[in-house]
Amino acid sequence: MISFESDYNNGMLPEILEALGKTNSDKTSGYGFDPYSESAKEKIRKAVDNENAEVFFLIGGTQTNTTVIDSVLMGCEGVICVETGHIEVHESGAVEAFGHKVITLPGKNSKLTTGTLSAYMDTFLADESHPHMVQPGMVYISMPTEFGMVYTREELAALYATCQKYDLRLFIDGARLGYGLVSAACDYDLPFLAKHCDVFYIGGTKVGAMMGEAVVFSGMKAPKYFFTNVKRHGALLAKGRMLGIQFDTLFTDELYFKISRHAIAMATRIRSIFEKHGIAIAYDSPTNQQFVVLSPALYEALSPKVAFEIWERKSEHEIICRFVTSWATKEEELDELNHILQAYA
């Protein structure tokens, strides 16, 4: 069976495995206070073009989201995101478990617009009883979005300006950041993104690492006791160098972006294969997540041979399915998918 189920169903990049093996016998301090982690942090500061950026390594995406949100917000504050936002739909209520309401707004193509945000904030502030409500303190977006969409340069700049207008912190979930930044739809680079948010993270788990995310405070200072809060949230790895080594490797010779470009090339081809066989594209995603519309019959025919995910049962005749590429996707796997589809053309 070939698999396009997710971008974290392989182990890790061979380069990372090699680096971990070479350093296995080293003895270093724990919790990220080691030379490998320091080297990785310095490389990330250089990559974001901000020598004052504060960088922290956490073990996973959900832990990262809850830790950042809980650390930045006061107890009475909530976080705004679109209705399809990852923290709203796919994190088991983790943010709210730490006492912060997720305030959902409708998105446009899975993105939050400045118009929607401004309208909500104006209405909220005009309500005389708003001091009795959960106070919006942060905006959360993901880049790319849950549907693989990319915020443009203009959209991101406008959204950050709107957040600043209403004294909201902007937090960007970058679990798949590499794939978003190298896509043809993205008209900016990592330094631009870092300058147009308060805090973001660089995803490792879904972009070649065994595990780990790198939180970067680029537009604000890290909250007091952030490191302690990382541990409180269960996101601190005792053998912290394991994360440092991985990000040090990813940010050597632009490996992070090279593997992301490979995934995008594979996604572009997988889309063309579906289109060649007359299979409709559900969402115009320019990144490594591709969404197609399958009939129940085609779904049943593909399932024993190809691993992928049902995204939405749109109707009794249409099933939206997600196919995901990664650093590990091989041309031969796409050839096999094409061959399988030919039998049902």
Sequence positions of predicted segments:
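Conserved core of the PLP fold type I
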Residues: 54-73, 103-110
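Active-site C-terminal subdomain of aminotransferase-like
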Residues: 135, 142, 150, 187-286
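Conserved PLP-anchoring active-site segment centered on the Schiff-base-forming lysine
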Residues: 71-89, 118
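PLP-dependent aminotransferase-class I/II
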Residues: 99-137, 141-144, 151-158
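Conserved N-terminal alpha-helix of the aminotransferase class I/II PLP-enzyme fold
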Residues: 13-61, 83-88, 94
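Catalytic PLP-binding core of fold-type I/II PLP enzymes
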Residues: 151-183
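Conserved C-terminal alpha-helix-loop-beta "cap" of PLP-dependent enzymes
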Residues: 75-76, 268-269, 273-343
